[in-house]
């Protein structure tokens, strides 16, 4: 089998912050499906890898549902609804997309879907019955048979909304029944009669909006679990009403019955619904309830009577009836502790109930696994994580061992490979969250291997250094020698970091601070009840990636410096290759505010202000030989600054303007978003919203002339879409051509090679090599592409003769991806 040219090897993401966007497939080794921005992600929790991305929605995915098979085999179809007003039916084969069918008709965002396989007496072939609810106050019912989809019916709720949906079949019949949980605090029950759904009941009892409903069949009875913002869970029992004419003593107290009659195959059947129980255990809104799915064990179909609920009180509860009394009791309660969190949106069982997962308010997933020896004990497990909003910037560490990302979710995250001695496969995970900020983060740059500077929607740049506890855990997880890594670090490294009660900056915690903490008993005796525990950090040695609770509190990096000088929000920052000089720029509408500030990374003093551009500088890049600084701007021009060879006094300029373009000489007609240098520092590349990529040069660092006119040295490459990111590989193609990655506003990444042909004008200098497939692409604008330093230390040794290049991408679709390229196959 021929190896692909481009592979996506690792993906980092998390579910959208909405209810119902997470669903676990039934059947053995079921996949977890969740919506990330506009994508549906299929994740394998056992292998801990993203299997594929299903891209088809054009706005946020709000709800997902696997279609369960009656025989307990793995699901191969799922439905999703999004803010683009459409429902998509996905068909999966061998964990890859086979077919997608779009269901259009809603006039508002779709936020609830459900589907079942339906067998009709008149037609032996299965059809799929799909129901969806949207913000247009309508519930639509669809029938899909083969490639054909037909809208059967629209249920209109006037000014109300159906917030939760679930389909099933009435006991001993093939008649579909639909439960709709509404904002009128009622559950509306519909049954299909003559191909039309008719309302048969309204169940009252909840005192606030219904957030979740789900059917489950136990023997000849059908049970409905419902949850609400009134903090309660109700379980309703639906059964065939006895037709016996036996007289009943009216003096006996019995539950109120809601009855209705259905005609099935010309036979009228009476059904009754009673309230089975009310479960009170949560202290805030209950957002989701789910029954444990049916599964096969030793060839026998099992249907455990267990219910899982998730609430905004930060807990998830597993309920089950007592074997002796039949009273429903709380079996297990799990949740998250500490941090800036606000509870759970959703929860799911895996196929046999041995694992449960919760979806938290800030997008994080929490996975627990049942102990095989002690079934009442559940332990946290490793699960995928990522940003819950747009990812704005990323950078590899100088040795290519990990990546750091920043996003508009106000977090900085560090991802690294987890190497296990007993497994050959290397998986990447989030191992630290160095910065949890109060502003949207915009940019970052590495100063050395364990130090970075970040910029946010504020006027200040912040510098962070890794604490000792991070370095220890990083070495343990990635399988590196701690002594080798620590030999290049200061001996007085802090242990960790914490945020003071009345502070906003990460404060270093040293060994003495930890040792002086009182014991729990001492604290109880001496505390007046009003003190705030200043040092929340506790060092811990990890041998595997940390859980979300640990990431929130124990992986902060201390802030070592603030850099003041800009008048508006920081927009971009970069560092030279020797890590001695930092350049930063902020948002600007005037020339004086668009100045680039150069900082000394040892003294942290301002070295120089470079004034040229009239609008925001969007990106900067030092040349690899450190002779030049390139800047591109929203004013559609670029400027090139040359480092002076003479040793200047402290306050004299270090860089002088070497070359620039103006409105006449600029090839670009729109904002220039990105720029990068060739590895030999001869040429630089610019990418713009006008869909053009241009190469400029040559840049001669020995030229001492005052005025320079550097023009395009390539043909203008039209990539067919707005360019938002450009990155040049530090390794040349075997044919001595430059390898260029171009990221587009639509989320696609294209790889080209370029070589100067010395023809006038330049022709055939660009070669299109490969582009990302639909599942590999991002779904929104790419914000940054970054090639890895090609040492290849963190990846498996590939077969002889195949050399892989690695680059990372991030975008507005909340996703970070690591791709690998076969250099020889380009």
Swiss-Prot record:
Repeat positions for WD: 13-53, 56-100, 105-152, 158-200, 205-246, 281-329, 339-378, 386-425, 436-474, 565-609, 612-651, 667-706, 712-753, 777-826
Keywords: Cytoplasm, Disease variant, Intellectual disability, Nucleus, Repeat, tRNA processing, WD repeat
Compartment annotation: Cytoplasm; Nucleus
Primary site of residence: cytoplasm
One Pfam family from the record: WD40
GO biological process: regulation of receptor signaling pathway via JAK-STAT; regulation of transcription by RNA polymerase II; regulation of translation; transcription elongation by RNA polymerase II; tRNA wobble uridine modification
Gene3D superfamilies linked: YVTN repeat-like/Quinoprotein amine dehydrogenase
Gene Ontology cellular-component terms listed: cytoplasm; cytosol; elongator holoenzyme complex; nucleoplasm; transcription elongation factor complex
Alphabetical list of InterPro entries matching this protein: Elp2, WD40/YVTN_repeat-like_dom_sf, WD40_repeat_dom_sf, WD40_rpt
Superkingdom per UniProt: Eukaryota
GO molecular function annotation: protein kinase binding
Claim: Nucleotide-binding is one of the keywords in the record: no
Pathway: tRNA modification; 5-methoxycarbonylmethyl-2-thiouridine-tRNA biosynthesis
Free-text note on domains in this protein's UniProt record: Folds into a two seven-bladed beta-propeller structure which is required for elongator complex assembly.
Family note: Belongs to the WD repeat ELP2 family.
Function: Component of the elongator complex which is required for multiple tRNA modifications, including mcm5U (5-methoxycarbonylmethyl uridine), mcm5s2U (5-methoxycarbonylmethyl-2-thiouridine), and ncm5U (5-carbamoylmethyl uridine). The elongator complex catalyzes the formation of carboxymethyluridine in the wobble base at position 34 in tRNAs.
Noted disease: Intellectual developmental disorder, autosomal recessive 58: A disorder characterized by significantly below average general intellectual functioning associated with impairments in adaptive behavior and manifested during the developmental period. MRT58 transmission pattern is consistent with autosomal recessive inheritance.
Subunit composition and interactions: Component of the elongator complex which consists of ELP1, ELP2, ELP3, ELP4, ELP5 and ELP6. Interacts with STAT3 and JAKs.
Entry protein name: Elongator complex protein 2
Organism: Homo sapiens (Human)
Name of the encoding gene: ELP2
């Amino acid at each position: 089998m021929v190896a692909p040219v481009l592979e996506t090897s690792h993906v980092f993401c998390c579910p959208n912050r909405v209810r119902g966007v997470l669903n676990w497939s039934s059947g053995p080794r079921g996949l977890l499906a969740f919506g990330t921005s506009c994508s549906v992600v299929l994740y394998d929790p056992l292998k801990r890898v993203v299997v594929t991305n299903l891209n088809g929605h054009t706005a946020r995915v709000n709800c997902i549902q696997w279609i369960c098979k009656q025989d307990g085999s793995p699901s191969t179809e799922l439905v999703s609804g999004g803010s683009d007003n459409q429902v998509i039916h996905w068909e999966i084969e061998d964990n890859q997309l086979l077919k997608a069918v779009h269901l259009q008709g809603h006039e508002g965002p779709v936020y609830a879907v459900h589907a079942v396989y339906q067998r009709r007496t008149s037609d032996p072939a299965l059809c799929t019955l799909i129901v969806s609810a949207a913000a247009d106050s309508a519930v639509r019912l669809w029938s899909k048979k083969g490639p054909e989809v037909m809208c059967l019916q629209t249920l209109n709720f006037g000014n109300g909304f159906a917030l939760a949906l679930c389909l099933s079949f009435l006991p001993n019949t093939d008649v579909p029944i639909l439960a709709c949980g509404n904002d009128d605090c009622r559950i509306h029950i519909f049954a299909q009669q003559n191909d039309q759904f008719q309302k048969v009941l309204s169940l009252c009892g909840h005192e606030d909006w219904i957030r979740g409903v789900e059917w489950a069949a136990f023997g000849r009875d059908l049970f409905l679990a419902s949850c609400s913002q009134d903090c309660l869970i109700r379980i309703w029992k639906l059964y065939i009403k006895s037709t016996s004419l036996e007289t009943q003593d009216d003096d006996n107290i019995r539950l109120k019955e809601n009855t209705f009659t259905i005609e099935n195959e010309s036979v009228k059947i009476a059904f009754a619904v009673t309230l089975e129980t009310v479960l009170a255990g949560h202290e805030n809104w209950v957002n989701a309830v789910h029954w444990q799915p049916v599964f096969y064990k030793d060839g026998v179909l099992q249907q455990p009577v267990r219910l899982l609920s998730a609430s905004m009180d930060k807990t998830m509860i597993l309920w089950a009836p007592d074997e002796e009394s039949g009273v429903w009791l709380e079996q297990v309660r799990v949740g998250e502790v500490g941090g800036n969190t606000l509870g759970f949106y959703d929860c799911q069982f895996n196929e046999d109930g041995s694992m449960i997962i919760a979806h938290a308010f800030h997008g994080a997933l929490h996975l627990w696994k049942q102990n095989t020896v002690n079934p009442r004990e559940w332990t946290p497990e490793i699960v995928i994580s990522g940003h819950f909003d747009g990812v704005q910037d990323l950078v590899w560490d100088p040795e290519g061992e990990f990546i750091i990302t920043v996003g508009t979710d106000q977090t900085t995250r560090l991802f690294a490979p987890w190497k296990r001695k007993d497994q050959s496969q290397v998986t990447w995970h989030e191992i630290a969250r160095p910065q949890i900020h109060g502003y949207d983060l915009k940019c970052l740059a590495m100063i050395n291997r364990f130090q970075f500077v970040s910029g946010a929607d504020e006027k200040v740049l912040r510098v962070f250094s890794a604490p000792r506890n991070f370095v220890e855990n990083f070495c343990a997880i990635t399988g590196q020698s701690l002594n080798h890594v620590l030999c290049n670090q200061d001996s007085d490294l802090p242990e960790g970091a914490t945020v003071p009660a009345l502070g906003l900056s990460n404060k270093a915690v040293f060994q003495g601070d930890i040792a002086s903490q009182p014991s729990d008993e001492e604290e109880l005796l001496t505390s007046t009840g009003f003190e705030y525990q200043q040092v929340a950090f506790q060092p811990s040695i990890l041998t595997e990636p940390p859980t979300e609770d640990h990431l929130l509190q124990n992986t902060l990096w201390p802030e070592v410096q603030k850099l003041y000088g800009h008048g508006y929000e920081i927009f971009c920052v970069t560092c030279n290759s020797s890590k001695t000089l930092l350049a930063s720029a902020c948002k600007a509408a005037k020339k004086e505010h668009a100045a680039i500030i150069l900082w000394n990374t040892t003294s942290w003093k301002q070295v120089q202000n470079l004034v040229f551009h009239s609008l925001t500088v969007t990106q900067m890049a030092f040349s690899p030989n450190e002779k030049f600084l390139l800047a591109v701007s929203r004013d559609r021009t670029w400027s090139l600054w040359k480092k002076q060879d003479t040793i200047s006094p402290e306050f004299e300029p270090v860089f002088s303007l070497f070359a620039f373009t103006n409105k006449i000489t600029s090839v670009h007609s729109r904002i220039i978003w990105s720029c990068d240098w060739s590895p030999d520092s001869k040429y630089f590349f610019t990418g713009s919203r006008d869909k053009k990529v241009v190469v400029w040069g040559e840049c001669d660092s020995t030229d001492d002339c005052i005025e320079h006119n550097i023009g395009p040295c390539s043909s203008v490459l039209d990539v067919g879409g707005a360019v938002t990111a450009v990155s040049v590989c530090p390794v040349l193609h075997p044919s001595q051509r430059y390898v260029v990655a171009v990221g587009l506003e639509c989320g696609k990444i294209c790889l080209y090679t370029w070589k100067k042909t010395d023809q006038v004008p330049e022709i055939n200098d660009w070669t299109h090599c490969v582009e990302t497939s639909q599942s590999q692409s991002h779904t929104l604008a790419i914000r940054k592409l970054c090639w890895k330093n090609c040492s290849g230390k963190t990846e498996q040794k590939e077969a002889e003769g195949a050399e892989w290049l690695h680059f990372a991408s991030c975008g507005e679709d909340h996703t970070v991806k690591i791709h690998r390229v076969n250099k020889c196959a380009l």
